[in-house]
């Protein structure tokens, strides 16, 4: 048991954070080498692991508001860079729209979701290599307590290893990628169910969004914004709550009042892709995510209950929490 985490609260940092990147993982046949960033607290042992999957076009260098928060409070956070990252485009100033354009023009776009899943599995498979590559980390990981976290496309990537199944064009279920090594999940702005909920654009270019959550059995927190309007669905913001209502594993849902797709700015400070910049909203996401994962991995810990009380009694009325 990690006393470093269990005895503390999400309201103050416990340690300085050290980060190392890039660590190169073995990835035979991959177009680009698989790079990861690792962030860890300077002190503590038996540290649980978060593997974070970035959103479309992003990279291992993003999401500092979340990553640094978690690492300062006892988690080792590992961030792979996936092949859709704009950092891999032959343009050092490529923005999000250029990443989308590159994806739409790629003959491999239909397989991109699967490449992400393969890279996520590679990352889990090579935890020993990661541990040995970062000075001061060896012997400090709790490899029995691994959580998957993702935002947007990254949430879909994480959900696939939590048990979500992509539905093929003929209606059959794609391969089952559920991984028994994973103990908890956290899905931020995750796409909902497919079928007629998808726009024609989504059906053509993002067929992996035709998915079923019926076999997602691992305990998971879903966080969505009630103002998240997406060109991928004909539904409204409620589409981003499907993972909670349609899976047996998702046991908590947080809906953020006024939240859009970036949930106040979780991908970075003052980044252009954030349309709902709100430091208080980011703070809520930081605290709620940390607390959920701690209580999910260490059931004797009351961090989730304590943090929900803080959130629901906030005079700013930032949102709601629904459990099942």
Predicted regions, residues:
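Conserved alpha/beta-hydrolase "nucleophile elbow" surrounding the catalytic nucleophile
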Residues: 54, 150-155
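Alpha/beta-hydrolase active-site loop
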Residues: 97-143
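Short beta-strand element of the alpha/beta-hydrolase
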Residues: 46-55
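The feature captures the conserved acid-bearing segment of alpha/beta-hydrolase catalytic domains
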Residues: 172-255
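Short glycine-enriched nucleophile-adjacent loop
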Residues: 128, 155-168
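Alpha/beta-hydrolase-fold serine-hydrolase catalytic core, especially in secreted/extracellular enzymes
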Residues: 258-261, 266-324
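N-terminal cap/lid segment of alpha/beta-hydrolase-fold proteins
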Residues: 1-45
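Short amphipathic alpha-helix adjacent to the substrate-entry channel of hydrolases
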Residues: 61-90
């Amino acid at each position: 048991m990690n006393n470093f985490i269990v005895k503390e609260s999400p309201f103050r940092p416990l340690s300085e954070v050290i980060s190392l990147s890039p660590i190169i993982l073995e990835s035979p046949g991959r177009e680009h080498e698989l790079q990861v960033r690792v962030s860890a607290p300077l002190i503590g042992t038996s540290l649980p692991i978060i593997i974070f999957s970035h959103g479309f076009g992003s990279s291992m260098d993003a999401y500092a508001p979340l990553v640094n928060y978690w690492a300062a409070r006892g988690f080792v956070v590992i961030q792979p860079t996936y092949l859709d990252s704009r950092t891999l485009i032959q343009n050092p100033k490529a923005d999000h729209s250029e990443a989308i354009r590159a994806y739409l023009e790629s003959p491999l776009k239909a397989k991109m979701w699967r490449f992400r899943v393969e890279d996520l599995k590679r990352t889990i498979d090579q935890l020993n290599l990661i541990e040995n590559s970062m000075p001061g980390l060896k012997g400090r990981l709790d490899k029995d307590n691994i959580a998957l976290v993702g935002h947007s496309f990254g949430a879909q990537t994480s959900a696939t290893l939590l048990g979500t199944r992509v539905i093929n064009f003929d209606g059959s279920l794609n391969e089952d990628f559920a991984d028994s090594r994973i103990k908890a999940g956290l899905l931020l702005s995750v796409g909902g169910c497919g079928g007629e909920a998808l726009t024609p654009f989504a059906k053509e270019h993002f067929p992996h969004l035709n998915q079923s959550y019926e076999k997602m059995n691992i305990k998971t927190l879903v966080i969505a914004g009630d103002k998240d309007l997406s060109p991928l669905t004909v539904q409204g913001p409620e589409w981003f709550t499907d993972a909670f209502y349609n899976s047996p594993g998702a046991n908590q849902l947080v809906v953020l009042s006024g939240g859009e797709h970036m949930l106040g700015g979780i991908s970075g400070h003052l980044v252009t892709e954030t349309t709902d910049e709100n430091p208080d909203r980011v703070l809520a996401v930081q605290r709620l995510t940390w607390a959920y994962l701690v209580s999910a991995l260490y059931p004797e810990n009351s961090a989730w209950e304590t943090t929900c009380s803080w959130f629901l009694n906030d005079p700013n009325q930032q949102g709601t929490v629904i459990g099942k």
